[in-house]
Design a protein with these regions (language model features):
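Short, charged surface segments at domain edges that flank catalytic/cofactor-binding sites
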Residues: 169-212
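Active-site-proximal structural scaffolding
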Residues: 17, 195, 203, 234-235
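Solvent-exposed functional surfaces
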Residues: 2-185
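Glycine-rich, flexible loop/turn motifs
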Residues: 31, 190, 223
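Histidine-centered nuclease catalytic patch
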Residues: 202, 214-236
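Intrinsically disordered, low-complexity boundary segments flanking structured domains
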Residues: 1-2, 210-215
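A generic structural signal for well-ordered coil/turn residues at beta-strand boundaries
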Residues: 5-8, 206, 223
Length: 236
């Protein structure tokens, strides 16, 4: 105890704007276990709001972990759950995390953030009731902000599509299925590209000739593509 009490400390008193303080915290955050970006933000925007928000999002076994641990990546005690929730809520209002925290810094409670977060998870569980490991870490809040008011999302039809796509060997990114079903963006699935073996087999089968013009080309001059697009049932 004496060694601890007698240990000399450096004390920094920071003046300036919130952004200047945040930059200064980043400069001195170089020794020991480095703080995460959200831990630094919590220091800069310390107040009643952050204290209450941490009650929901920042403790082992916290309410957010109990409700949505299967959907979130990171660790609550390193403020990653809190960062995720704030980033989603801030995005809904077209703001940065820093701007959102600055706006609410002196609010007496973070119940609005918690209610928003619960709405996100309730929506996810309503349209995708079956939990899968591929759901962990997806940008659910951003998807909710865009698609949360849609009335055309049928959970049974979505589940049937999920099962079909999970069994499709050409879909190499299974976690992208959920975003694909909501956005229609095929790139989310990372459809399996032709490898050299597949392309060479097709090249030999076609006797080195282009299937479109009928001319003969060297293999390196040819490009392999689906006869029928993947979206219409074509296979790689």
């Amino acid at each position: 105890q004496k060694q601890i009490l007698d240990y000399p400390l450096f004390v920094y008193v920071c003046d300036g704007t919130d952004s200047e303080k945040l930059d200064w915290f980043r400069i001195i955050n170089i020794a020991g276990e480095q703080l995460t970006d959200q831990e630094l933000r919590n220091a800069v925007y310390a107040g009643s709001w952050v204290s209450d928000a941490k009650r929901y999002f920042s403790k082992t076994g916290c309410a957010a972990d109990t409700l949505a641990g299967d959907y979130l990546k990171g660790a609550s005690i390193r403020q990653e759950y809190l960062e995720t929730a704030i980033s989603w809520a801030a995005s809904a209002e077209g703001k940065t995390i820093e701007a959102y925290m600055g706006q609410h810094q002196n609010d007496p409670s973070a119940v609005l953030l918690w209610n928003y977060f619960r709405s996100v998870i309730d929506w996810v569980q309503a349209i995708f009731p079956r939990k899968r490991k591929e759901m962990k870490g997806l940008p659910w809040g951003l998807l909710y902000n865009t698609h949360g008011k849609r009335t055309d999302l049928d959970p049974k039809k979505l589940e049937a599509e999920i099962q079909r796509l999970m069994g499709d060997e050409d879909v190499t990114k299974k976690s992208g299925i959920y975003e694909y079903l909501l956005t229609g963006e095929e790139r989310k699935l990372s459809i399996r590209a032709f490898d050299r073996r597949d392309a060479l087999a097709a090249y030999e089968k076609q006797k080195h000739k282009c299937a479109i013009c009928g001319e003969e080309f060297e293999f390196e001059q040819m490009h392999a593509d689906h006869i029928t697009p993947w979206s219409k049932g074509g296979k790689t």
